[in-house]
UniProtKB/Swiss-Prot annotation:
Its main location: cytoplasm. It is found in: Cytoplasm. It comes from Clostridium botulinum (strain Alaska E43 / Type E3). Pathway: Cofactor biosynthesis; thiamine diphosphate biosynthesis. This is Probable tRNA sulfurtransferase. The keyword Ribosomal protein does not apply. Pfam families: ThiI, ThiI_fer, THUMP. Keywords: ATP-binding, Cytoplasm, Nucleotide-binding, RNA-binding, Thiamine biosynthesis, Transferase, tRNA-binding. It comes from the Bacteria.
């Protein structure tokens, strides 16, 4: 029996009205890129993508990480007649394990005789008559759900055991671009993932403080960028030398304002690279109140030097929720490796938690801001994943 991979869109794509075709086209393009190297045939049928391939397992593994895909399933392709549909449904039930079942039918082909409820009832009766072991119907919480779709050329049958959940969201690249300030911690990779899930193209900037931070710390961030790139088409990682900026701040500025001034330089560098690379926004992994620099006042002061939108998708999330997502997207184990990043050195004993914009601006007059930012960007390294 022929088998295809059914790719279901995330439900949100159906709500895009006149723009739906653009989202569908981008999703198909992204699927094609994700399955590069695998011989496939696309079949598009009214809100469904079917994929024909001999490499089903590898294809499903890749498809489950495509933003805009809610789920994928291996389906049996059967002729449009009740006998074939019934037999395939029974085979699917035998393959699965459970004591209760339900049949759900979608009669997309309105020329097919009967309605969806009657068809499901007939298939269920056939299963009960022909299944050897004890089996009961449960329409609310069945162990096995047999799905039947009857379309114009074929019918498709699969069970809930054949389904692999996707990441959903919107097709990658549909909603502009952002520069993620990527550290080696838990939060920023999750922030980047959530932005990419909303269709935002991801670029990353990492601030490296050699020799105070080791090459292992840099390697950790590179590994995090690779993991994020497994969900996207590609990622540019900009590695910015940050030691000279930090030393200048340490030498000339008040100790209790070191952290917030450092954060402002990070923001300036991210915005400047974004400007030069045509990137529309900046993204940070900050969460309100999580550390001393992430108070409301601290975030306001950080934003003061930004020349484009700054997104903080974790802003109201608890640390435990962030950690759960990190585990799910497989960045957690890398993030907790014990290598310090530039944010963990030169930390004042008593950082200011309620900085004022006018006070910080006055303190920054001691520094040659434009020269420090320009030199750091001129010496940065660009790595593509």
């Amino acid at each position: 029996m022929e088998k295809l991979i059914l790719v279901k869109y995330a439900p949100e794509i159906f709500l895009k009205g006149l723009n739906r075709n653009k989202f569908e086209k981008r999703l198909r393009d992204n699927i094609g890129k994700k399955l590069e190297g695998i011989k496939i045939e696309f079949i598009h049928d009214s809100g469904r993508y079917f994929i024909k391939t001999n490499e089903i397992n590898e294809s499903i593994k890749r498809l489950s990480n495509v933003f805009g895909v809610s789920e994928v399933a291996v389906v049996d392709v059967v002729e449009i007649d009740m006998d074939s549909i019934k037999k395939s449904s029974l085979e699917k039930l035998i393959e699965a394990e459970g004591k209760t079942f339900k049949v759900s039918t979608n009669r997309a082909n309105k020329n097919f005789e009967g309605n969806s409820t009657d068809i499901s009832r007939d298939i269920g009766a056939y299963i009960l008559s022909n299944y050897n072991d004890e089996m009961n119907v449960d329409v609310k919480t069945p162990d096995i759900l047999i799905n039947v779709e009857i379309r114009n050329k074929n019918a498709y049958v699969w069970s809930n055991k054949d389904i692999t959940k996707g990441v959903a969201g919107l097709p990658y690249g549909m909603n502009g671009s952002t520069m993620l300030m990527l550290s080696g911690g838990i939060d920023s990779p999750v922030a980047g993932y959530l932005m990419a899930k909303r269709g935002v193209e991801l670029n990353c900037v990492y601030y490296h403080s050699h020799p105070y931070t080791s090459e292992r710390a840099k390697d950790k961030v590179k590994d995090l960028a690779k993991i994020l790139a497994s969900y996207t088409e590609k990622i540019n990682l900009y590695v910015v030398p940050f030691t000279e900026i930090q030393m200048a701040i340490l030498d000339k500025c008040r100790e209790d304002e070191l952290t917030i001034i450092m954060r402002r330089f990070m923001m300036r560098v991210a915005c400047k690279i974004a400007e030069e690379k045509g990137i529309q926004s900046v993204t940070s992994g900050e969460s309100i109140g999580q550390v001393a620099s992430q108070t409301m006042e601290g975030l306001i002061v950080s934003n003061d030097c930004a020349d484009r939108p700054v997104f903080r998708p974790l802003i109201a999330m608890d640390k435990t929720d962030i950690m759960d997502i990190a585990r799910k997207i497989e960045t957690y184990e890398t993030s907790i490796l014990p290598y310090e990043d530039c944010c963990t050195i030169f930390v004042p004993k008593h950082p200011k938690t309620k900085p004022r914009v006018d006070s910080i601006r006055e303190e920054e007059k001691k520094l040659n801001i434009d020269e420090l930012v320009r030199k750091a960007i001129d010496e940065m390294e660009n790595i593509v994943y």
